[in-house]
Amino acid sequence: MHRFFFSTKDTFIDSGSSTLDGETFLDKNVGQDEILELKKVFYNRTFRNPTRVLIQFDADEIENFISSSNIGSTSYSASLRLYETKGTSGLSETYKIAAYPISQSWDEGIGKESDRPKTTEGASWKYRKNRDGSSELSWQTAGGKYIAGDEVTQSFSSESPDINMNVT
């Protein structure tokens, strides 16, 4: 049996800045963008900054499914699937992805990558919640406070650009 759970909110956060005009992305929100950009940013062959994807699922829905489906008597697995959308020209042949549970709440926000000027309302590298600068809540740790020790990691090598990560 397969059961699919879809995210209730998502965004990606970026620790860098524009190479064109220097505008910082630390407070930029893209919560309404259709694409989640998980990447390491390089400039002139030098690593500049990481991005992170934030995805939230309805924990009650998952918990109710587990408790009502007698999973304990059978083996099961859980996967996170992410699909590549922009082409593979910048994709490394080998890479590793880690998934961590986040320990603080966050707002998806209202921004898109193409917004000019940038939108700052919602989660960003610097803030987990931001309402037009009037009620900012910073992450305990910039880039998101996560629970160390509960992470899952997976290495990929010359595979499909689509990610099917075992998060069991």
Pin down the residues of each PLM region.
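Secreted, disulfide-rich extracellular signaling modules
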Residues: M1-T168
